[in-house]
């Protein structure tokens, strides 16, 4: 069976960010791999451990009662369109932003909690 490479690429171009994210997760699950760039083994192992302590992920745990306000806040934070932001909020718990400094992560947490969302930092 021959692959229609051009057709697959066309479908990927038309897909939303959420659809592409779901695709990556499905591929990771199906083939038991991780979508991460390769790194040098020696120095990178120490750097990853240090970076893990210095960076935080902001996870939307629950939208709460003011879902519309939370969607607007997620749009503002991520720059996503309305449909993608709504999909992200509906898929909670969902990581909204990754690799932030502690100060930036706390600012986003306060912003989301200010509109009624439940947020955790990881």
From Swiss-Prot:
GO biological process, one term: translation
Species of provenance: Lacticaseibacillus paracasei (strain ATCC 334 / BCRC 17002 / CCUG 31169 / CIP 107868 / KCTC 3260 / NRRL B-441) (Lactobacillus paracasei)
GO molecular function, one term: structural constituent of ribosome
Keywords, ordered alphabetically: Ribonucleoprotein, Ribosomal protein
Keyword Ribonucleoprotein carried by entry: yes
Signal sequence region: none
InterPro entries: Ribosomal_bL12 (IPR000206), Ribosomal_bL12_C (IPR013823), Ribosomal_bL12_C/ClpS-like (IPR014719), Ribosomal_bL12_oligo (IPR008932), Ribosomal_bL12_oligo_N_sf (IPR036235)
NCBIfam families: L12 (TIGR00855)
CDD domains, sorted: Ribosomal_L7_L12 (cd00387)
Source taxon at top rank: Bacteria
Entry protein name: Large ribosomal subunit protein bL12
Function statement: Forms part of the ribosomal stalk which helps the ribosome interact with GTP-bound translation factors. Is thus essential for accurate translation.
SUPFAM superfamilies, per database record: ClpS-like (SSF54736), Ribosomal protein L7/12, oligomerisation (N-terminal) domain (SSF48300)
Protein family according to the UniProt entry: Belongs to the bacterial ribosomal protein bL12 family.
GO cellular component, one term: cytosolic large ribosomal subunit
Subunit structure, as described in the record: Homodimer. Part of the ribosomal stalk of the 50S ribosomal subunit. Forms a multimeric L10(L12)X complex, where L10 forms an elongated spine to which 2 to 4 L12 dimers bind in a sequential fashion. Binds GTP-bound translation factors.
């Amino acid at each position: 069976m021959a692959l229609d490479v051009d057709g697959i690429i066309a479908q990927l171009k038309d897909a939303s960010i959420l659809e592409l994210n779901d695709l990556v997760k499905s591929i990771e699950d199906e083939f038991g791999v991780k979508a991460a760039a390769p790194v040098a083994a020696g120095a990178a192992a120490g750097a990853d451990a240090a970076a893990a302590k210095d960076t935080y992920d902001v996870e939307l745990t629950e939208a709460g009662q003011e879902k519309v306000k939370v969607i607007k806040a997620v749009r503002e934070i991520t720059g996503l369109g309305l449909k993608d932001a709504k999909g992200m909020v509906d898929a909670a718990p969902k990581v909204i932003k990754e690799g932030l400094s502690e100060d930036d992560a706390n600012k986003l947490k306060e912003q989301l909690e200010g509109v009624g969302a439940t947020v955790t930092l990881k």
